[in-house]
């Protein structure tokens, strides 16, 4: 017999597929779909940079930091051939009203701006009571599967849902949003665009992007022009709106969620991203090695060593998410400081497995989400 959760439901009852008729009632606008088709690789490559900003209160007190990076990567799923894509990583951490909190987003985005896989981790560390939420989105065949794990104190809740990818044209995930906003800012869009999105509870809804025009902002000691975009996720419960302003090349200058007491601001002017001419590949001359022993043996040893190092470096370049995952894990490890590190690591990385079978008792999570995502 399957274990029941606090509401008397078995795990199987929490794994549900969205009804096609409900999902098909929502769609992205034709203008939004045309925009996605118009984005080329050359334009995307101009958005490969890192933003580093500070989170400040209304009174100007620095509360934490926020960073977003986009870099080239490779993605492979279910033994298929590797696909070139972009790795988007966003992380925010800080202390608001004396409460440590943070959000991490890791996503693989295709050249067509489709989400191949995404992991979102949010936490709030209250005194004697911690809240933790992990959400995974991954493509499995013709389905987009969403796995959510919510931990509140000692209580754990899991749920899984899926959507047919044929009904998700124009879907923009949180990771894809961070890349698309840079493109919209570079183009200085003139008209609103409507896409599909998921809200904080994993519900399918629409999201809109509307231009706010240009205004002046002080960054460091300079007064610069920035272009604003307002993004709204039209959740079935309560819509959420963010206002973001960008430099001419897509660097994020400021970001605020309407109703939030904190603002994310850029404190120093970055180097603007412009098209560059390709530099010729460097030619490295092999330096002669003076061996005192068997030359052939040492030569074979060094050749093999170089081959292994090159192979390892190539793998890390193709999979920059390795460093991202380890960095996020170390940050969370130092925050929690568990006694059993091995068990903690096993539990931390378990949700990243798309093949894991949920086997924990279910508890209710139908109350309002305590998380406040500041990474949109």
From Swiss-Prot:
A Pfam family of the record is: CATIP_N
Q: Does the keyword Cytoplasm apply?
A: yes
Listed transmembrane segments: none
Source domain of life:
Eukaryota
Q: Which UniProt keywords apply?
A: Cell membrane, Cilium biogenesis/degradation, Cytoplasm, Cytoskeleton, Membrane, Nucleus
Coiled-coil regions listed in the entry = none
Broad class of where this protein is predominantly found: nucleus
**Mind telling me which GO cellular component terms the entry cites?**
actin cytoskeleton; cytoplasm; nucleus; plasma membrane
Q: Which Gene Ontology BP annotations are present?
A: actin filament polymerization; cilium organization
Q: Where is this region: Disordered?
A: 355-376
Location relative to the cell: Nucleus; Cytoplasm; Cell membrane; Cytoplasm, Cytoskeleton
Q: What does this protein do?
A: Plays a role in primary ciliogenesis by modulating actin polymerization.
Q: Which family does it belong to?
A: Belongs to the CATIP family.
Official protein name in the record = Ciliogenesis-associated TTC17-interacting protein
Origin organism is Xenopus laevis (African clawed frog)
Upper lineage: Eukaryota, Metazoa, Chordata, Craniata, Vertebrata
Q: Which gene encodes it?
A: catip
């Amino acid at each position: 017999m399957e274990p029941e959760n606090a509401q008397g439901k078995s795990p199987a009852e929490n794994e549900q597929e969205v009804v096609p008729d409900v999902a098909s009632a929502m769609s992205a606008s034709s203008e939004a779909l045309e925009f996605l088709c118009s984005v080329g690789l050359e334009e995307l490559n101009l958005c490969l940079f890192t933003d580093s900003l500070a989170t400040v209160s209304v009174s100007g007190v620095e509360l934490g930091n926020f960073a977003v990076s986009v870099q080239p990567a490779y993605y492979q799923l279910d033994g298929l051939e590797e696909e070139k894509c972009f790795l988007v990583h966003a992380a925010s951490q800080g202390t608001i009203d004396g409460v440590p909190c943070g959000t991490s987003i890791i996503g693989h985005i295709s050249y067509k701006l489709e989400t191949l896989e995404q992991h979102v981790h949010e936490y709030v560390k209250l005194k004697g009571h911690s809240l933790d939420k992990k959400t995974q989105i991954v493509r499995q065949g013709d389905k987009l599967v969403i796995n959510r794990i919510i931990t509140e104190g000692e209580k754990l809740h899991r749920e899984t849902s899926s959507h047919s990818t044929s009904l998700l044209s124009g879907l923009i995930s949180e990771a894809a949003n961070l890349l698309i906003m840079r493109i919209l800012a570079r183009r200085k869009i003139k008209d609103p665009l409507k896409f599909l999105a998921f809200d904080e509870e994993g519900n399918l809804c629409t999201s809109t992007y509307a231009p706010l025009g240009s205004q002046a902002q002080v960054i460091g000691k300079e007064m610069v022009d920035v272009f604003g975009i307002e993004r709204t996720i039209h959740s079935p419960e309560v819509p959420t709106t963010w206002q973001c302003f960008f430099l001419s090349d897509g660097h994020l200058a400021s970001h605020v969620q309407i109703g939030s007491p904190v603002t994310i601001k850029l404190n120093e002017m970055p180097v603007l991203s412009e098209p560059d001419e390709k530099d010729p590949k460097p030619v490295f001359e092999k330096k002669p090695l003076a061996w005192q022993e068997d030359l052939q043996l040492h030569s074979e040893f060094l050749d093999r060593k170089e081959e292994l190092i090159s192979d390892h470096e190539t793998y890390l370049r193709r999979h920059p998410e390795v460093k991202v995952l380890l960095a996020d894990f170390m940050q969370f490890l130092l925050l929690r400081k568990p006694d059993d590190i091995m068990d903690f690591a096993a539990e931390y990385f378990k949700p990243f497995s798309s093949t894991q079978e949920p086997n924990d008792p279910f508890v209710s999570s139908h109350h309002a989400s305590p998380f406040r995502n500041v990474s949109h």
